[in-house]
Amino acid sequence: MNQEHKIAIIPGSFKPPHKGHYEMIKHYSELVGPDGEVLVFVSKPSAKNQRKTPDGKVISPELVKQILDIYCQSLGNVNVEIAQVSPVKACYDIGERLKSGVLLFGCSKKDDDIKRFNQIKSYIESRNPNLIVLDPITTAVDVTASEDGVVSATDFRRVYGNPEEMMQFLPDHLNDGTKHKVIQMLLQ
């Protein structure tokens, strides 16, 4: 990558945030380097699009932000925000506003994640010729796997309420005390 200021934007629901989310954020943090920045946009879904735990609990965007801040504490170039519009729309908006630099969009190689960004490179470059937009396909991350398969928020929600099973979904770099704190935050 060239020496221009690099910004990675990672939109998503992150409900609940798990080790795969952290590994993706860490990947982009390393990719943009210490002088770059990573903006993580957490969705604020409408009532019909909320993701719920088996017992019907809604995981709030505010809780997601608090947990991602804990996960990313050691990553000095990461800022987690709650998106006021759809997180993908926030990506487009930032791409239009930036004056120059290199822009990356965070996504995984899982399912349809990359498809959210099919048009973004050409769209932003046509409106902002001073910006270099990297093709999301070239920077997409592999999905984090565990012994039981791919780590997903859906599977994390399935074990919600069972602290022992929830532990396997938390980032490996967290100590046990921090993992217990995160689980307590999720279960409150």
Residue spans for each PLM region:
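Nucleotidyltransferase catalytic core that binds NTPs
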Residues: M1-Q188
